[in-house]
C-alpha cells in the first residue's frame, strides 16, 4: 500500500473515532506534574519503555482498546478486520508528553489515542522498524565428521 493511501485511512480512522466520542466508564489516571516530570526524564534518557510498562499506561491502554472493541481502527477504515495489539499516540509521546494519558486532545477534542494492529503501527512508525541483518558467518568453521 502506498504511504499516501495509508495516511488517508489513518486520518479517516481518527475522524471516525472522534465522531463517536465515547468515553470509558471507569475513571482513568491523569498526567500530574510529578508524572510528567518523570516521563520527561525517561524520554530524555531514551527509556520510554519504562513508561509503557507503567500501571497508569496499562490502564489507559486497556480502556482505549475496550472503547475501540479491540479492533484496529485503520484496518476498519480500509474495510478489513484486524485485532488491535497496540494503542498509538496520534501526537507522538516525545512531541507532546503532556498528552501521554489523554484519550482526546483537550485543545482540539480530536482522539489522541487509537487502537491499531502491529502492522499499522509499524506503518505509523517507519523510523522504528528494525533492520534485520543476516547472521554473520561463524568466526571458526565447525565440522561434524
Model segments located where?
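Short linker/helix segments within small regulatory modules
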Residues: 93-113
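Short cysteine-rich loop/turn motifs with clustered Cys
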Residues: 56-91, 117-119
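A short linear-motif detector with a strong N-terminal bias
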Residues: 30, 51-52, 64-67, 93-95
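A boundary/linker detector
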Residues: 1-59, 76-81, 132-145
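Intrinsically disordered, low-complexity peptide-like regions
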Residues: 19, 87, 119, 123, ...
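Short Cys/His-centered divalent metal-binding micro-motifs
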Residues: 79-80, 110-137
Amino acid at each position: 500500500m502506498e504511504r499516501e493511501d495509508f495516511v488517508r485511512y489513518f486520518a479517516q480512522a481518527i475522524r471516525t473515532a472522534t465522531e463517536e466520542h465515547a468515553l470509558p466508564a471507569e475513571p482513568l489516571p491523569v498526567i500530574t506534574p510529578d508524572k510528567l516530570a518523570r516521563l520527561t526524564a525517561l524520554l530524555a534518557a531514551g527509556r520510554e519503555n519504562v513508561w509503557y510498562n507503567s500501571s497508569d499506561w496499562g490502564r489507559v491502554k486497556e480502556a482505549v482498546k475496550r472503547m475501540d472493541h479491540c479492533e484496529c481502527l485503520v484496518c476498519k477504515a480500509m474495510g478489513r478486520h484486524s485485532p488491535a495489539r497496540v494503542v498509538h499516540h496520534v501526537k507522538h509521546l516525545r512531541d507532546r508528553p503532556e498528552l501521554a494519558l489523554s484519550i482526546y486532545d483537550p485543545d482540539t477534542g480530536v482522539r489522541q489515542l487509537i487502537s491499531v494492529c502491529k502492522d499499522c503501527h509499524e506503518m505509523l512508525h517507519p523510523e522504528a522498524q528494525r533492520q534485520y541483518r543476516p547472521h554473520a558467518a561463524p568466526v571458526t568453521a565447525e565440522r561434524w565428521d
